[in-house]
């Protein structure tokens, strides 16, 4: 695959793209789950770990300092399984998200090609539009699962939600349908530029990197890592705002950070964070996010390419006369 001049978006049927995308999301999610829990807890921490003055209103909130210390503390106080809190809704989200994302990406790309005909737009622009559209559709469709993942990961020793079914019932009763979509504006505002930049960068880098003789065909993985790091850094403040909006509601003061402020709206939340935490507050958890994004994207893209290739080979073998 790496040495092929074909683009990912031109290969396979819709069903094959969906299967490959779902498989890639499932595997990637399990691998990076502990880093995801750490990232969420750092993002929700509105007090500075290094500024004692910000500790005056902790209300029993925990203080996390860095990736490894946070992992150790979670393991020590909550057990090994705590590093996979929220993994059930997260697995469902990643499988669904990846399948919808790749399928929509391919469909939009083919639609653009049919629309413009001979006057085909540049590959980078095509990838940006298709990636942004795929991200927006997938984010909206799977957002309730994303919110549940965040709330489960934010739980400490005290269990607010005992199961996935109980959490859905509790939110529906106490917050209504809108409760499942808190922070959606930040989610879509984040994912559209992220996926556009990611796919445009990935498609640009994949072919030239694929011509290099790299071990285990890792040109795809390298392109995925670079594309992810570039895109993730640019839109990280929206990711943090989304997380803080997701834990708003009647359970806001019961998570590991019991002093989470009341937020309302994307830009008002951004303004509140800048005023009270400075611009650095918008980038809490960025380091672990990049550590997480790199292996997650590498595993996702590498697995997607390989699974799709296996499906194409299997289809060809089925069509070949025996």
Curated annotation (Swiss-Prot):
GO terms for biological process: thiamine pyrophosphate transmembrane transport. Pfam families: Mito_carr. InterPro entries: Mit_carrier, Mitochondrial_Carrier, Mitochondrial_sb/sol_carrier, Mt_carrier_dom_sf. GO terms for cellular component: mitochondrial inner membrane. Keywords: Membrane, Mitochondrion, Mitochondrion inner membrane, Repeat, Transmembrane, Transmembrane helix, Transport. It comes from the Eukaryota. PROSITE patterns: SOLCAR. It is a multi-pass membrane protein. The chain crosses the membrane at residues 18-38, 92-108, 128-148, 180-200, 221-241, 285-302. GO terms for molecular function: thiamine transmembrane transporter activity. Solcar repeats lie at residues 12-111, 122-208, 215-310. The keyword Transmembrane helix applies. It is found in: Mitochondrion inner membrane. Belongs to the mitochondrial carrier (TC 2.A.29) family. Mitochondrial transporter that mediates uptake of thiamine pyrophosphate (ThPP) into mitochondria. This is Mitochondrial thiamine pyrophosphate carrier 1. It comes from Sclerotinia sclerotiorum (strain ATCC 18683 / 1980 / Ss-1) (White mold). The gene is tpc1.
């Amino acid at each position: 695959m790496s040495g092929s001049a074909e683009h990912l978006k031109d290969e396979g049927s819709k069903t094959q793209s969906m299967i490959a995308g779902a498989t890639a999301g499932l595997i990637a999610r399990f691998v990076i789950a502990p880093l995801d829990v750490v990232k969420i807890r750092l993002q929700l921490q509105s007090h500075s770990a290094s500024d004692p003055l910000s500790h005056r209103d902790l209300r029993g909130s925990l203080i996390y300092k860095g990736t490894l210390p946070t992992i150790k503390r979670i393991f020590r106080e909550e057990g090994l399984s705590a590093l996979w809190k929220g993994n059930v809704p997260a697995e469902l989200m990643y499988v669904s998200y990846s399948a919808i994302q790749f399928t929509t990406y391919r469909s939009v790309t083919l639609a653009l090609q049919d629309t413009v005909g001979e006057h085909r737009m540049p590959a980078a622009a095509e990838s940006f539009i298709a990636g942004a559209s795929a991200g927006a559709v997938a984010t909206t469709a799977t957002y309730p699962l994303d919110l549940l993942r965040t709330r489960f990961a934010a739980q400490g020793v005290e269990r607010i939600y005992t199961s996935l079914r109980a959490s859905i019932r509790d939110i529906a009763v106490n917050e209504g349908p809108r409760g499942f979509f808190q922070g959606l504006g930040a989610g879509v505002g984040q994912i559209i530029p992220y996926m556009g930049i990611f796919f445009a960068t990935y498609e640009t880098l994949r072919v030239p990197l694929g011509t290099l003789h790299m071990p285990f065909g890792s040109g795809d993985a390298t392109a995925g890592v670079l594309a992810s790091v570039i895109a993730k850094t640019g839109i990280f403040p929206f990711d943090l705002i989304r997380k803080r909006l997701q834990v708003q509601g009647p359970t806001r003061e019961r998570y590991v950070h019991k002093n989470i402020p009341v937020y309302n709206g994307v830009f008002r939340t951004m303004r509140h964070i800048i005023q009270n935490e400075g611009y650095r507050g918008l980038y809490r958890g960025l380091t672990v996010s990049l550590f997480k994004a790199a292996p997650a994207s590498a595993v996702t893209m590498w697995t997607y390419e390989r699974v799709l290739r296996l499906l194409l080979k299997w289809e060809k073998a089925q069509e070949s006369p025996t």
